[in-house]
Amino acid sequence: MSGNWVHPGQILIWAIWVLAAPTKGPSAEGPQRNTRLGWIQGKQVTVLGSPVPVNVFLGVPFAAPPLGSLRFTNPQPASPWDNLREATSYPNLCLQNSEWLLLDQHMLKVHYPKFGVSEDCLYLNIYAPAHADTGSKLPVLVWFPGGAFKTGSASIFDGSALAAYEDVLVVVVQYRLGIFGFFTTWDQHAPGNWAFKDQVAALSWVQKNIEFFGGDPSSVTIFGESAGAISVSSLILSPMAKGLFHKAIMESGVAIIPYLEAHDYEKSEDLQVVAHFCGNNASDSEALLRCLRTKPSKELLTLSQKTKSFTRVVDGAFFPNEPLDLLSQKAFKAIPSIIGVNNHECGFLLPMKEAPEILSGSNKSLALHLIQNILHIPPQYLHLVANEYFHDKHSLTEIRDSLLDLLGDVFFVVPALITARYHRDAGAPVYFYEFRHRPQCFEDTKPAFVKADHADEVRFVFGGAFLKGDIVMFEGATEEEKLLSRKMMKYWATFARTGNPNGNDLSLWPAYNLTEQYLQLDLNMSLGQRLKEPRVDFWTSTIPLILSASDMLHSPLSSLTFLSLLQPFFFFCAP
């Protein structure tokens, strides 16, 4: 990860290309651009309602394929190529259980082509207004997809509308997932966090190449949703990513979401599983790595279903310390940020994947039993949770609604607000939002009680209603929803351009200062103040104080103790 991505034999050739060859506009076969590794040729598309064509470059390599001896290592430089490289086909997905994507298409009312799946997946897609060329210096937005770090793809997100309407460059990045992105031996032989290091490599590629597509390497905004937002939040805290971006947007995810690290007993159990798989001693890290690098990728994908501890780790490189400690110590660069949540984060999508039975209703006893198992709160203190969330709720549907609100609070809202406060207190400009609109397209697929569910804002941010290619992100949008999408694209792009989302013809979005005002994103915009303040106080003051007086733990508890108590919920409400 030295950052030296230029093959020595390419330096002179590349310099000649820059001086001698035109890079402007599409050729008869498609737009061509040079990179430091060789020439690529993309395609040109248009979107609904905009006269601006967009140059699209798909499957651009930012690192070498992580195969064989490169499995479970830091991403390495991609090799240069001599001939014009075709960049009009979607890259393979990183290895994953692709059945989830089929389920998501139905649940999220989206459609996209069938993609291949491979370990050879470290590619990015670029969307640029056709007029953009070297010297244009347009703002760059780099998107990291979500999917619980287990599923996801760059190609299900089409940046064409955002690029056309807002005159920005959009880059969508793939990174290793699951065991391929996070396997670790918890020592120097395989320190882990490969997925995050892939993201650093992609940002390094952007710094070195995006100017040839018309982007400004000194104005890069990273953004993402769910696991992608967790990635953005993590990159802010990592010294490895220092200087590679300048602004950040976190949609429904931050680095202190609690499920992201494993218990010690889970680590030990999982190493035993891997050792048994390889026929090695679990203490021999080098032997385990040699074995795993020779195994077929599908066998490793199957193996990963038997493990749950291969997640984020404090490796001393990407994460020099726990994210919460880095935040509290202000050990990060204070850059402008947008942080936000939806008003029903665990309303349907997440529980539907893992525990659909609770959506039909829940009695108080069942709800409290589930909460006890999730939060590890001693039974004698469950009455506090009951009083906070269920004291005036009696029907099965009322209790269900409160349970879903509780889960959304614990896993999304409270961590997001805590993170916003840390960023604010470090001197960074912060803008907070709550997305509140339920898309009309879900009228026949989601129950009426569901409001703005997890991931619902994404189709608005990307202008899904204006796409007309083979990626369908927003069918059946109403005219009001199209207007909301235009406003949200404008907010995001204005922020990418200036570090402040406010602009002409947009409702005022105040900074998140000590008054804690925030923008309620809806068909009719409005301002709110101190979002869910009683619930934040409950989880950061009342519960930790009670638990610190109990015998369940042997060390003092901080006001954020609840963040470390929720890991068993990983497979229930993973973003």
Swiss-Prot record:
Enzyme Commission number: 3.1.1.1
Name of this chain's protein: Carboxylesterase 5A
Lineage summary: Eukaryota, Metazoa, Chordata, Craniata, Vertebrata
Q: Which family does it belong to?
A: Belongs to the type-B carboxylesterase/lipase family.
PANTHER family reported for this sequence: CARBOXYLESTERASE
Compartments where located? Secreted
Superkingdom, natural source: Eukaryota
Sorted alphabetically, which Pfam families does this protein's record hold?
COesterase
Q: Which gene encodes it?
A: CES5A
